């Protein structure tokens, strides 16, 4: 069986306090400059809660996910996952977390089944445990049987995203970090992913942080919705509370009132910088 870190009964699922992260950007005119990705962000998630973070590309959503999953170190502040510090207790945190992102990481020459078997071994699962479980989970996420032995590099983004979701379901994470999980998916696959998120909550009691710019998705799935803009968390309330606060009829109107910008104005600058740092 997968070896989980002990979960303290009274610990918050996520507790981030004044979390800061900056990246260094090279500019031909101004030379090097520091660009804030997160600026004193504080956020808590209760166990079993689903919280959606809305933000444009470059708002800091991916940075927040990477910090909580120990892929990045914060420049300031602190973050704990079920009581474990993401810096000091990284190994314990990783045993409790699974991250599904738009740029899901796989061994590209290996097949979906091979990637899932590798993930299972990484999490301490035995061959006997995964022999029947992996085909069942691939079927659950709608992955066609005749594509399961193809190299990942031959698969579309949507297909790869389904494998990422299968990996998350296989390892039954206590905290599921979803970074744009439905980006690039067709409408049917998108609905399947949303049903998967509901299943993770109902069957596995997972806590979920959903980073997205799909307003309907956030409102349908999340208990609370946060608005993140240029590294600043402007609000974190229920969808109805956000609409009431900004005197808006829709979540989109509330987002525009909070940020002064719509999603059509989004830029990809900081996300590109993050990818450069992580490369």
Tell where the protein language model's regions lie, with residue ranges.
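Conserved ABC ATPase "signature" region
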Residues: 98, 117, 121, 129-147
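Conserved catalytic motifs of ABC-family nucleotide-binding domains
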Residues: 172
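Catalytic Walker B motif of ABC-type/P-loop ATPase nucleotide-binding domains
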Residues: 176-179
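Helical segment within the ABC ATPase nucleotide-binding domain
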Residues: 191-204
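ABC ATPase "signature
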Residues: 236-237
